[in-house]
A protein has these predicted regions:
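Short, flexible loop segments at the rims of nucleotide/cofactor-binding pockets, characterized by
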Residues: 48-51, 74-80
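Active-site metal-binding core of divalent-cation-utilizing nuclease and nuclease-like domains
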Residues: 21-23, 27-67, 114
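Conserved catalytic cores of phosphodiester-cleaving nucleases, focusing on short active-site segments
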Residues: 62-78
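C-terminal, charge/polar-rich interaction regions
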Residues: 190-252
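A conserved mid-domain beta-alpha-beta active-site/ligand-binding segment of alpha/beta enzyme cores
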Residues: 132-212
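Catalytic cores of nucleic-acid endonucleases
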Residues: 78-118, 124-127
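Interdomain/boundary linker segments immediately adjacent to catalytic/signaling cores
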Residues: 1-24
Length: 252
C-alpha cells in the first residue's frame, strides 16, 4: 500500500502490528502491560504507573502503585537473564512484590532461572505475553508473594522527590528538620529511618501515586499503540495537538 494514502495514526498502527508479528521489543511489552493494567484490571484514577525507575544500581522497567507497589521486569525475546538476580535483589530493596514478564517461548526457562535464586526467586511472580497478546492468564501466571528480606529505608527514600519526602516527614512527625541545605537530604533520610519500614514504604507509595495527573477520559482517548509514550512522557496537555497530527495524511 502507498503510505502517502494513509494518516500518521494509521501508519503507526501498521508499524505496531508489524512489531507484534516480527519483533516484540521492550516498548511493545511495556505498552501491552500498561493497556492491560490501566484499561482492564485497574484504572488511572486509582493507579499510577512509572517506567525506568532507578532502584539501587538497577532501573525497573515498569512500576505500578495503587494500594501497594509492584515492579514488573520485562524480558522480551531480545533480552537474556544474565543480570536478573541482581536486578530482582535491588527491586526487593524498595518493593515487596516483584514479577517478571516474559514471552511464551521463555516460560520454562524463567521457571528454571528463578528456582536457582532460592527464597527470593520463589517469591517472584511470573507473567507471560502470549501470541494473542494476553498477559494475565491464570494457568500460565504465578502471582508474586510478599518478600521483605532486603527492604530498606534508603532505597525507598531515594525514589522520592524532595517535596514528597518533606510531606511524609511533616505529616508523620508534625515538624521537619531545620538544617542547612547541604544537610537537607541526610537529615530527612535520618528521620525517615525512624518510621517502621512497612509504614515508611506505604507512605512513600502514597506520595508517588499523587504524581499521576491523567484522567480516565484522557487515557481512553490515547491511541492504543501510543498509550505508553503519552502516559510516561507526561504529554497529556499536548493531546489535542497530537490527535491532530495523527489525523494528518502522511507526506513522505
Amino acid at each position: 500500500d502507498d503510505p502517502e494514502s494513509k494518516s500518521h495514526g494509521q501508519l503507526i498502527s501498521e508499524i505496531y502490528a508489524h512489531l507484534n508479528k516480527q519483533q516484540r521489543n521492550e516498548y511493545f511489552y511495556m505498552n501491552t502491560l500498561l493497556n492491560k493494567l490501566l484499561c482492564g484490571i485497574h484504572n488511572v484514577n486509582t493507579t499510577s504507573a512509572f517506567s525506568q525507575v532507578r532502584i539501587g544500581h538497577s532501573i525497573a522497567d515498569f512500576v505500578m502503585i495503587n494500594g501497594e507497589g509492584r515492579v514488573y521486569e520485562i524480558k522480551s525475546d531480545l533480552d537474556n537473564f544474565d543480570r536478573l538476580y541482581d536486578q530482582l535483589r535491588y527491586y526487593f530493596c524498595a518493593f515487596s512484590k516483584v514479577s517478571v514478564l516474559v514471552s511464551i517461548h521463555e516460560l520454562e526457562k524463567i521457571h528454571e532461572v528463578l528456582a536457582s535464586f532460592g527464597d527470593m526467586g520463589d517469591a517472584v511472580g511470573i507473567y507471560v505475553l502470549s501470541e494473542r497478546g494476553t498477559i494475565f492468564n491464570k494457568e500460565r501466571s504465578r502471582e508474586p508473594s510478599i518478600y521483605n528480606e532486603f527492604l530498606n529505608h534508603s532505597s525507598i527514600f531515594k525514589m522520592l522527590r524532595k517535596r514528597e519526602y518533606e510531606n511524609i516527614i511533616r505529616a508523620y512527625f508534625g515538624v521537619v528538620p531545620q538544617v542547612e541545605p547541604v544537610f537537607h537530604f541526610s537529615a530527612f533520610l535520618e528521620k525517615f529511618e525512624e518510621i517502621p519500614i512497612i509504614e515508611a514504604q506505604k507512605l512513600a507509595f502514597q506520595e508517588m501515586k499523587k504524581r499521576n495527573k491523567i484522567t480516565v477520559e484522557q487515557f481512553q482517548k490515547i491511541q492504543p499503540e501510543l498509550k505508553a509514550v503519552v502516559y510516561f512522557s507526561g504529554l497529556t496537555s499536548k493531546m489535542p495537538a497530537l490527535d491532530q497530527l495523527l489525523k494528518i495524511q502522511y507526506r513522505g
